[in-house]
Swiss-Prot record:
Gene Ontology MF term list: GTP binding; GTPase activity; ribosome binding; translation elongation factor activity
Membrane topology field: Peripheral membrane protein
Record's protein name: Elongation factor 4
GO biological process: positive regulation of translation
Native source organism of the sequence: Lawsonia intracellularis (strain PHE/MN1-00)
Known catalytic reactions: GTP + H2O = GDP + phosphate + H(+)
Length: 606
């Protein structure tokens, strides 16, 4: 027990597991916990470390989790293994890079039936940038379609890792887990750092707990930390007294002190996540370290969309839900906004598309709020005639055409991994999305890595869905924003009876504006119910209408009660109806159904 509370530094191993979705990362973590008797049969459940219901259901890891594992080797020595479970998705890249900074090594888990995928590659490169020792692990060898030699060759070719010592396992059955634990102890380095130096610790995750305030996960690089110490955070300069200090093994265990190389958690009446940012440095107030740990950056949202309650009476429920979600997700931002078409709602910012999907799903699932979401948008930069540069995250905020000198849009560097038979489909899709081809590589016989530079706005819309359907679900992709470039962009407005609908405005490339406007007008014609008066649907750039559709009026037979008789009587009734319709058209409001907004979101299906 003493070894668990006060381990010898050279007997500590901090490691993370890198894997693509469904390659077996959480399953391997489960088996390690079972093999080391940390989780009893009674407590067993799949994906033990994935606390969120949504994480278990989608089979992905969204937040980093950690567990301290005491392990006795074959020769009787006790080691402490700290597993830091990282998210694998590109949207959470910064969280991954901070989690990797807290470790010295990684297990690279690859599904032998699938091979190397794009997100695996992205995270391996991150690990190698952090000077990690990487152990390749070949998973799912119990499946008949496993091709171990081919995958080994692919890893050596694409990543450059020596696979002669790669460990073959089946995380599902537990085969080979003992070899993995021995390899962690033998091949990964012990953490460096001096317990007698001033405290320097890295925050790699934090979340909000209703009873204790913010819980901070950290890794100590130098120094020692004790309960009741007063700590200071570098980026905010705020100080807190530690009220609770401990480790997860896998449930929380209180510990009086932790020192260099160890991973743990602390609570200290920290009120908001913004005060304990991922990547920040913790030190002691009275004996601080001089330099922060490098690599800290403020996370900025890159994708925006409007979220509105479908019932306006749910506005306060949605607001409370957003406040609650923000407590546990510092990367998610929101501010109130109003739309003439949708009423009161919120403009929300996300790290990427998966992040946006997860937030929307959690709002609907955990808080039972029905949402209307507007089309996602990225941040554009506008240079206006007065020489200023503005950032625009909402198409309706774009200045008038006459005031714009240049419009800049973000570009991304994208790597797409795809079986060779689908290369033609992927190239066609990327060209259609205004892509610039950079490279095509063939790391293995049947696999291709296609590299493109694409406008980010083309990706946020429907790129991923179309990529999956063009490749029968076999493609995987990884992207990062690289720079802003001048583009010939315009704002396309949709007008109903001459009135612009702000929630349907989009920024598109001028070459695509006509096709987009025409398609959307046709879709709206199908989804907006007929009214008692004619409805004109127009797509316009500034004052110029580029497409128009009309929904004809419902006709009530006002002459039904005239039996034969005078034609002037009928004409009088018809004229009266015509006048009434004119007045209605002038006064009438066209109710936009939810389907109209869905039509705008599904524009890529044409």
């Amino acid at each position: 027990m003493k070894d668990l509370l006060m381990p010898i530094q050279e007997n500590i191993r901090n490691f993370s597991i890198i894997a693509h979705i469904d390659h077996g990362k959480s399953t391997l973590a489960d088996r390690i916990l079972e093999y080391t008797n940390l989780v009893s049969d009674r407590e067993k459940r799949d994906q033990y470390l994935d606390k969120m219901e949504l994480e278990r259901e989608r089979g992905i890891t969204i937040k980093a989790q950690t567990v301290r594992i005491p392990y006795i080797t074959a020769d009787g020595k006790t080691y402490i293994l700290n597993l830091i479970d990282t998210p694998g998705h590109v949207d959470f890249n910064y969280e991954v890079s901070r989690s990797l900074s807290a470790c010295e090594g990684s297990l690279l888990v690859i599904d032998t039936t699938q091979g190397v995928e794009a997100q695996t590659l992205a995270n391996v490169y991150l690990a190698l940038e952090h000077n990690h020792e990487v152990i390749p692990i070949l998973n799912k060898i119990d499946l008949p379609s496993a091709d171990i030699e081919k995958v080994k060759a692919e890893i050596e070719e694409t990543i450059g890792l020596d696979c002669s010592t790669a460990i073959s396992i089946s995380a599902k059955t537990g085969l080979g887990v003992d070899s993995v634990l021995e390899a962690i102890v033998q091949q990964l380095p012990a953490p460096k750092g001096d317990p007698n130096n001033p405290l320097k610790a890295l925050i790699f995750d934090s979340w909000y707990d209703a009873y204790q305030g913010v819980v901070v996960l950290f890794r100590i690089m130098d120094g020692t930390i004790k309960k009741n110490d007063i700590i200071k955070l570098f980026s905010t300069e705020k100080s807190y007294e530690i009220t609770r200090l401990g480790v997860f093994s896998p449930e929380a265990i209180d510990i009086p002190q932790l020192s260099a190389g160890e991973v743990g958690f602390l609570c200290g009446n920290i009120k908001t996540l913004g005060d304990a940012k991922v990547g920040d440095t913790i030190t002691l107030l009275h004996n601080p370290c001089t330099k922060a740990i490098p690599g800290f950056k403020e996370i900025q949202p890159v994708v925006f969309c409007g979220l509105y309650p479908s019932e306006s009476s749910d506005y306060d429920i949605l607001k409370a839900a957003l406040e609650k979600l923000q407590l546990n997700d510092a990367a998610f931002s929101w501010e109130p906004e109003t739309s003439q078409a949708l009423g009161f709602g919120f403009r929300c910012g996300f790290l990427g598309l998966l992040h946006m999907e997860i937030i929307q799903e959690r709002l609907e699932r955990e808080f039972q709020v029905e949402l209307i979401a507007t089309a996602p948008s990225v941040i554009y930069k506008v240079e206006t005639t007065d020489g200023k540069i503005q950032e625009i995250d909402n198409p309706s905020k774009l200045p008038e055409l006459g005031k714009i000198v240049h419009l800049y849009e973000p570009y991304v560097h994208i790597d797409i991994h795809v079986p060779s038979e689908f290369v033609g489909n992927v190239l066609k899709l990327c060209e259609e999305k205004r892509g610039i081809q950079k490279n095509i590589a063939y790391p293995a016989q049947q696999r291709v890595i296609i590299t493109y530079e694409l406008p980010f706005s083309e990706i946020v819309f429907d790129f991923f869905d179309r990529l999956k359907s063009a490749t029968k679900g076999y493609a995987s992709m990884d992207y990062e924003v690289i720079d802003y470039r001048i583009s010939n962009l315009v704002r396309l407005d949709i007008l109903l009876n001459g009135e612009p609908v702000d929630a349907l405005a989009v920024i598109v490339h001028r070459d695509k504006a006509y096709h987009y406007g025409r398609s959307l007008a046709i879709k709206l014609k199908k989804t907006i119910p007929r009214q008692m008066f004619e409805v004109a649907i127009q797509a316009a750039i500034g004052q110029k209408v580029i497409a128009r559709e009309s929904i004809s009026a419902l006709r009530k037979n006002v002459t039904a009660k005239c039996y034969g008789g005078d034609i002037t009587r009928k004409r009088k009734l018809l004229e009266k109806q015509k006048e009434g319709k004119k007045r209605m058209k002038r006064m009438g409001n066209v109710e936009l159904p939810q389907e109209a907004f869905l039509a705008a979101l599904q524009m890529g299906d044409d």
